[in-house]
Amino acid sequence: MNYPFCIILNILIYNSLSLYYLFPLFGNKSRKDNGYVLTWFFLLFLCLYSLYSGDWFHYREKLDFYEMYSFSGLEPVYDMILFQIEGRYILFRFIVWGIALLLLRTLFHRLAINSFRMLGFFVIWGILFFAYARVSLGLSLLFYGYSFWVKPTHKMRFIGYLWGTVCVFSSIFCHKSLVVLVLLLPFTFISLYRKRFLFYCCCCIILLFIFNNLILPYIDIYLSQLDGTEYFSAESYARPFGKKIVDASVRSPLFILMAYLVYELVWKKKQKEFSWEIQRYFVFVILIFLTSLTLFFSDIKSQVLFYRVLYMIFIPFAIILSEAYFIVSRRVLLLCSLMAYLGGNMWLAYSFLGHLNGTIQ
């Protein structure tokens, strides 16, 4: 496979889709989403060939490992898929990310959100993260199931709640890190206002102090013996300077826009203009963001846990942006979306150069 050529295709698709949505979203004229079906096709292509991330090669190595030992080291659900497809890696990605995209499309439809705005913000802000990480399947399943909790079906309401519960807890089997979101989920049903937001911030500070001073010192000596403890080591997050710049360019727009949304929607109480179910997703976004910040300021040497939790935000974040479109300043949305778009291109360009010199990170 010609990896640099695939990266060029990634760049072309990401830019074409982003610009297709960006100009109408922030122009004077709205556009019907005549490219709706084609957009999903291109999103699937990005998921199949997301060579801009080292995870694409990591999962392929897991498949090779499975062929030798009938065990991939991934969650059992992926071993079940690998057992059926007999080592065809692209087919594996087609099944996993195809189901994830289908769940995502169904979620958008259930919430009755404008498809053009929803896809536009998801493409600009979230697709590059969604396309490379296997947690995307679990995230799609969790947020899809959660939609039955906040917007149950009119008929057979109990069945809807039950189905949503099954989906939410099944998501954990797709990626163990989703336990974090499941634990946060009950708190999303508590309305978020200024005093409560400050209370949550204080709770994060207290938890941070307890973790850093009372918990982490006692478990630190055992980390090297535990599965998955590469998340806690500084070496696991060793990055060249160029990658640090790319990471900053990708994350900075999110931090800026989150601060603005907290001011507009929490401090100025504009979230009241959201429907009840959208308010729940907004609280979810805030809780995920605060959790990621807590991990960032913890004494854990690696930032892997921080950014893994942070990147779980993009599905509900796109939902919130599409609904906040008529509530907050479009100029701020445009500026931050442009920054996110440029950050995405920096990421793709860095990966392209990495493929050319054989040092993809």
Give a label for each model feature:
Residues 199-203, 329-347:
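Signature aromatic-anchored transmembrane alpha helix within multi-pass, membrane-resident enzymes
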Residues 115-132, 136-145, 177:
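Membrane-embedded helix bundles of polyisoprenyl
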Residues 34, 105-124:
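Transmembrane-helix signature of polytopic, membrane-embedded enzymes
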Residues 94-110:
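Transmembrane-helix motifs of polytopic, lipid-linked glycan transferases
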